[in-house]
Amino acid sequence: MRRNILSSILFLLLIMSVHVAAVEEGLVENEVTFQLREMVLPCPEFSCPTGFVCDTTAQKCRQEVD
């Protein structure tokens, strides 16, 4: 039982360290950036935040595409 708990903890630490290394190297997008890309605001009532443009057809703020 103790061996299973220890190996589970070590496995979780390994996964966390790989994720942290990937985030630091830019291989995994930051969750905040992902949430901003998914942000949909109604244009007429609110102005779009920086990096977003108003899609007049859908009446929603969409991420600006370069």
Swiss-Prot record:
Covalent S-S links between cysteines: C43-C54, C48-C61
Organism source for this protein?
Answer: Ethmostigmus rubripes
Top-rank taxon, per record: Eukaryota
Write the protein's name: U-scoloptoxin(04)-Er2a
**Which protein family is named in the record?**
Belongs to the scoloptoxin-04 family.
Tell me the leader sequence span: 1-22
Which tissues show it? Expressed by the venom gland.
Question: What are the subcellular locations of this protein?
Answer: Secreted
Annotated Gene Ontology cellular components are: extracellular region
What keywords were assigned to this record? Disulfide bond, Secreted, Signal, Toxin
Q: What is the lineage of its organism?
A: Eukaryota, Metazoa, Ecdysozoa, Arthropoda, Myriapoda
Keyword Aminoacyl-tRNA synthetase (UniProt) = no
Q: Which GO terms describe its molecular function?
A: toxin activity
